[in-house]
Amino acid sequence: MARYRRHSRSRSRSRYRRRRRRRSRHHNRRRTYRRSRRHSRRRRGRRRGYSRRRYSRRGRRRY
């Protein structure tokens, strides 16, 4: 389904852009506060895990 929507740009963009733009402005600000407070631990845990594996040398030197 994702491929079909991407290829049909003329019709999908006109309808999806208008709906997403109106919702994105109002809902993005409200969801950012809720997600940041609730899932802040999960996101930080995942980011720390990746940062240690990728930037293990840089992290040790900085600390």
UniProtKB/Swiss-Prot annotation:
GO terms for biological process: chromosome condensation; sperm DNA condensation. It is found in: Nucleus; Chromosome. GO terms for molecular function: DNA binding. Its main location: nucleus. Residues 1-63 are annotated as: Disordered. It comes from the Eukaryota. Testis. One of its GO terms (cellular component) is nucleus. Keywords: Chromosome, Developmental protein, Differentiation, DNA condensation, DNA-binding, Nucleosome core, Nucleus, Spermatogenesis. InterPro entries: Protamine_P1. Protamines substitute for histones in the chromatin of sperm during the haploid phase of spermatogenesis. They compact sperm DNA into a highly condensed, stable and inactive complex. Belongs to the protamine P1 family. This is Sperm protamine P1. It comes from Antechinus stuartii (Brown marsupial mouse).
